[in-house]
Amino acid sequence: MAKKSAIIGFKGVALAPVLQDTITAYETGEAVGIQYAGSMTRTPKESSQELYYDDDLYAQLREVSGDDVEVRFAEIPLDQLAQLGLGRYDGETGTLEADFNVTGRTYAFRCVTGTVDGLPMFFNWRVFELTGLRFDNFATRSGSLSVCEVIMSGVFKRPKLAGAAAYAIRQPKDDGTDLAACNAWIAAAETLPKA
């Protein structure tokens, strides 16, 4: 029977700070995990143009520059929200002084998904420009068991380094012998081009 690797889960989100993203090099630090990921939605950022010559369609040009991304979490601790750029956290008082804007924060976005066959898949989007962190709408508990999620928004982009892929996907061998290496891959710092 053929292997079934349709994705059925989403967990293990980790963000690695992008330390360098230039036309000559790409480098990240080690990734830091964020628990309780709920869902991720992506919408392609694309433009297209049809070129007509001699009253006929000559070419259709299409450019996909990335994805608008929204990730929902059950919670993110206040100190971790501060590390992501939402504000300043005072550990002594347990207070986060925050603003509505998160600017200038770029990470590699990594996550793990489950599959029908039970063998996970590991994703690494190399450039995730964080554009927002906010709490979802609040609702009374009466008749509702919903959670006020923390919503992280941003854009997946291509690295500036020529030839560097926008993302990488890894899946362990069927026998799972390299599962530890896959888990380490999600957390590790990355440098391109490879030495």
Explain the meaning of each model-derived region.
Residues 97-134:
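Short helix-loop boundary/capping segments
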Residues 56-81, 145-159:
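Oligomerization/assembly interface segments of phage tail-like spikes and tubes
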Residues 1-39, 195:
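Polar/acidic, low-complexity leader/linker segments enriched in S/T/G and N/D
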Residues 27-64:
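N-terminal interaction modules that seed assembly of large macromolecular complexes
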Residues 76-100:
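Charged, amphipathic alpha-helical segments
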Residues 129-195:
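Mixed-charge, glycine-accented linear interaction segment located at domain edges/termini
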Residues 25-31, 35, 121-130, 169-172:
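Short amphipathic beta-strand/extended segments with alternating polar/hydrophobic composition
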Residues 49-57, 86-95, 134-139:
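Short acidic (Asp/Glu) patches
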